[in-house]
Amino acid sequence: MALTSEQKKSILSEFGLHETDTGSPEAQIALLTNRINNLTEHLKFHKHDHHSRRGLLLLVGRRRGLLKYLADNNVDRYRDLIARLGLRR
């Protein structure tokens, strides 16, 4: 299910650098993580939805690139973010 504007605002206020931050890596990774979790739940019930599976793989790759960028530029922010999101790394 798509994010509502209220859900997006709450995610951005929690993970962004300021209230309306949408461009920082932390904000982008948090939004991608939410979309990935929603798609993962969808695919548990719709195992043969291969179009959505490909979309999921693209989202995971985009998130991986942003995480790599953050890890290369600021390790402390990277470690804090993966701890807050509960990601394995």
Swiss-Prot record:
What name does the UniProt record give this protein? Small ribosomal subunit protein uS15
| Entry function | One of the primary rRNA binding proteins, it binds directly to 16S rRNA where it helps nucleate assembly of the platform of the 30S subunit by binding and bridging several RNA helices of the 16S rRNA. Forms an intersubunit bridge (bridge B4) with the 23S rRNA of the 50S subunit in the ribosome.
Taxonomic lineage: Bacteria, Bacillati, Actinomycetota, Actinomycetes, Mycobacteriales
One GO CC term on file? cytosolic small ribosomal subunit
Q: Which UniProt keywords apply?
A: Ribonucleoprotein, Ribosomal protein, RNA-binding, rRNA-binding
Q: Which SMART domains match?
A: Ribosomal_S15 (SM01387)
> GO molecular function: any one?
rRNA binding
Q: How does it assemble?
A: Part of the 30S ribosomal subunit. Forms a bridge to the 50S subunit in the 70S ribosome, contacting the 23S rRNA.
Q: Which gene encodes it?
A: rpsO
Task: Tell me which family the UniProt entry assigns to this protein.
Answer: Belongs to the universal ribosomal protein uS15 family.
